[in-house]
Amino acid sequence: MADERSGKGEDSGKLLYCSFCGKSQHEVRKLIAGPSVFICDECVDLCNDIIREEIQEATTSDSSDRLPTPHEIKETLDDYVIGQTRAKLALAVAVYNHYKRLRYEDKKGEVELGKSNILLIGPTGSGKTLLAETLARLLNVPFTIADATTLTEAGYVGEDVENIIQKLLQKCDYDVEKAQKGIVYIDEIDKISRKSDNPSITRDVSGEGVQQALLKLIEGTVASVPPQGGRKHPQQEFLQVDTSNILFICGGAFAGLEKIIRDRAEKGSIGFSAVVKSQLSSKSVGETLKDVETEDLIKFGLIPEFVGRLPVIATLDELDEAALIQILTQPRNALTKQYSKLFEMESVEVDFREDALRSIAKKAMERKTGARGLRSILEQVLLKTMYDIPSEQDVCKVVIDEGVIAGESEPIKIYKNSEQAKLAADE
């Protein structure tokens, strides 16, 4: 039998076996011969997987050894998010200090450094989520988005706060070590504000109750998370995840917060240096939000303990027409570049005229949806064209002007070797 396994019986027609897994030549697709040894295709695949994993781990550790500086973090954010300089600076410094703190603690330093979680305040579509996503991609750490409106206190219908950590674990294939250095973005945090200043007999399970549940998670605790989530398999051994090194970024529009800030400023303005009321009301929402203080957030409905866990507050400005046009054209993932690429795959060039871009920006401002509304406008405008183009072989260019955005005309299609189409394009 030993002779058969080593392949000595090759000439005599005896069965050949893989020297590694012991499978016969009939059990595998291919058996590769070497000097007195054989290896099957399955073992070759396994070896490739092992080598690939080791290379990937080595590359990841090399890339994560160097922490990007605040300047480099801001430059990367500039590639994807237009404007919002103040928020970018605050995020760059906070994130840099957070991961610097992790490295310092790994070396068992004498001074204990606190965690700087972040609160982003800004209108819908101003770039809060995109900033958090870009940070996670740059730092190559696990990232998850949680919706605060779906969270409830433990024991009530809805998601428990531990589900947030569950989602983070899923992003890194349940690697606890990686998850403990991840970033969690909790969206719509303003929607879990306390419903009223007065304590109520009925429990506020989706408002103040959620804030209380999030307190320890954000500050740092050891959360018990089942490997496959939920409570369906109580016999499973729970994973212990320490959240003290997870960076939490909370974001919300905080509609009405600017009024609370103005009211506070008016009450405090007495004497010769007082700010005139008309000056306060003439300030934009973005400018007013710059002056936000802890007491304003507490009056809005966040409990003091929760606000205390979010020491870094960054406010984002409303996007004006010029900023929306820049968003359409400048970032790496600009919508005009994305649609141009889609048309390019059909060997068609797409030309967005300047007046069309202005018209798209105006429409988005009217809808009050910020940058998020730009894609839906473009999808609506280009739907019929994207439906027709794959079936039309001779189209070489599509021109989008102001009339197309307003719904007054169809996109101009320029055909190969068509004089009429060329004249139409010139007009």
From Swiss-Prot:
Binding site for Zn(2+): C18, C21, C40, C43
Superkingdom per UniProt: Bacteria
Record's keyword annotation contains Cytoplasm: no
GO biological process: cell division; proteolysis involved in protein catabolic process
Binding site residues for ATP: P123, T124, G125, S126, G127, K128, T129, L130
SMART domains on file: AAA, ClpB_D2-small, zf-C4_ClpX
PROSITE patterns assigned to the protein according to its UniProt record, in alphabetical order: CLPX_ZB (PS51902)
Domain named ClpX-type ZB: residues: 6-59
A Pfam match: zf-C4_ClpX
Annotated GO MF terms: ATP binding; ATP hydrolysis activity; ATP-dependent protein folding chaperone; protein dimerization activity; unfolded protein binding; zinc ion binding
UniProt keyword annotations, A-Z: ATP-binding, Chaperone, Metal-binding, Nucleotide-binding, Zinc
A GO CC annotation given for this chain: HslUV protease complex
Subunit (UniProt): Component of the ClpX-ClpP complex. Forms a hexameric ring that, in the presence of ATP, binds to fourteen ClpP subunits assembled into a disk-like structure with a central cavity, resembling the structure of eukaryotic proteasomes.
Function text: ATP-dependent specificity component of the Clp protease. It directs the protease to specific substrates. Can perform chaperone functions in the absence of ClpP.
NCBIfam families: clpX, PRK05342.1
Entry's family note: Belongs to the ClpX chaperone family.
Protein name: ATP-dependent Clp protease ATP-binding subunit ClpX
